[in-house]
Amino acid sequence: YKRGVTVQDAAGTNEFQDVQIRWGHKFSDKLAMKVNFGYLTGTDWIANSEKDKLNRSVFPGDYNHDGINIYGDEVATNIYGVAQAMIGLGLLPAGAEALVPSEVVSRTGYNETDMAEPDATSKKADWGVYYRPIDGSNLEVSYVGKWGTGKTLYQGINRYAIKNFLMTQHKLEVTNDNWFARAYVVEDDAGDSYDMTFAAINVNRRWKPDLNWFAEYVGGIVNGQLAGMNITQAHALARQTADTGRWLPGSSEFEANLAEVIQDPDLTSGAKFTDNSKFYHLDYGYNFDDKWDWAEVQVGGSVRSYSLNSGGTIFTDVDGPIEYQETGFYAQMIHREVDDRLAVTAALRYDESEYFSGQFSPRTVISYTAGEYKNLNFRVSLQTGFRTPTTQDLFIGLDAGQARLVGSAEGNPDRYVRDYGISAAGQALGVPATVTVTGADAYNNSYEASSVQAFAAAGDPSLLKVAEVDYVKPEKMQSMEFGFRGKLSRTFTVDAAVYRN
């Protein structure tokens, strides 16, 4: 054990400061402890691109503008359909739809700097207690805890303001010369984090519902056309009309409503996401080195149990936490011959998840060291591996605005259920005013998005192409490698490998 204190204080030109403190102490030959603490604060990178996500156009020239770092403009509709609905309700005279182009228009959004502050902070600490109860033995019992919280901006499928999040880990470990066992739990809390896209969408909707905004936009288009304006001028008048009285960033109305929206976890009216997920993990292993002379043998395994708890804001866990388990076992043997110049390694691992059949992943490596000074090494290896889908691959149920992400674990698509309103044009074709869609419909009863866009443009049903969506499954990999490493002189070393994955 070593004892001491380390203090570090760093700063940068972009209002950045980083402080690190470390402390360790050996109380006796049996007991020691260490503590680390870190604090970071600064100004985060400001994302301010207003270019459209798809065609990189610049607002306001694009009426259906979805800016990269503009939020709330994801809400869009075809204003010709709105005009038809208004005529049906008697809000526009018959024939007025002739003055309204069949174009998709998006609502006016807010910039990222309006939705979140760019300052970033990080506070973290860890501590450990280490105890060796038996004199002359390497048996050690230890406890390590980790804690972290902070604030930052995060880019995922949407842009998120991560605020006051909390993550903790607690680990208990017992080790000896030939074996070990460790168990730990990791838990997180999303704190006051929120989705900036839905924050902007729902601030807009609090000020003026989508139906009202698009109806006023259509009214502006009609008035502009009747006044002799060209279509570009009419669009400008329409947006000005629909945005009249809009809450501006910095106003008391905007700030008060934003504060309420980001504390509401219902994405139809708010933007907060909750996550109190955790997982428990156990590792264990035994080394038979001192038992057998003919080979080095190790065996072990692991168990991991998940508890996903986002209240339906991230996963499909509206009715309660989603729990599942993964297990794994491994064995490895190394046999040496020819004065330890030849080494043969054989390993086998078996992993199983509740949602997938068990997977074997064998590995074999043969290496030979040549040369009088053992300075030439040749190796050949055959390896297999796989990756089990992540918790999000399996259980996500996230509304991302213009897209919905639905994991494909057994039963997960059926748990994702949403009701959608149908446009007047759709209702004219006999479709009900609202339809209920599940994630299973997306997997089993859907068309490719590009073919739907082609159909919408041409009106030809033959352009529709049924989507064939595969359910997620473990990724598998096989690798073969031939390698050589040799020191050919005091100043020249060759390290080369040929492999195929």
Question: What does each model-found stretch correspond to?
Answer:
Residues D9-E15, Y39-T43, G145-K151, N176-N178, ...:
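Transmembrane beta-strands of outer-membrane beta-barrel pores
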Residues R3-V7, M33-F37, L139-Y143, H170-L172, ...:
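Transmembrane beta-strands of outer-membrane beta-barrel proteins
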Residues G12-E15, R107-G109, T113-S122, I162-L166, ...:
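Short sequence motifs at beta-strands and strand-loop junctions characteristic
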Residues I21-H25, A125-Y131, H170-N176, L282-F288, ...:
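Residues on the lipid-exposed face of transmembrane beta-strands in outer-membrane beta-barrel proteins
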Residues K171-F356, D495:
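Face-selective signature of the C-terminal outer-membrane beta-barrel domain
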Residues G411-N501:
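Membrane-embedded beta-barrel scaffold of Gram-negative outer-membrane proteins
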Residues S122-T168, V297-Y306, G320-S367:
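Surface-exposed extracellular loop regions of Gram-negative outer-membrane beta-barrel proteins
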Residues Y1-K53, T121-K123, L139:
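Outer-membrane beta-barrel translocator/receptor signature
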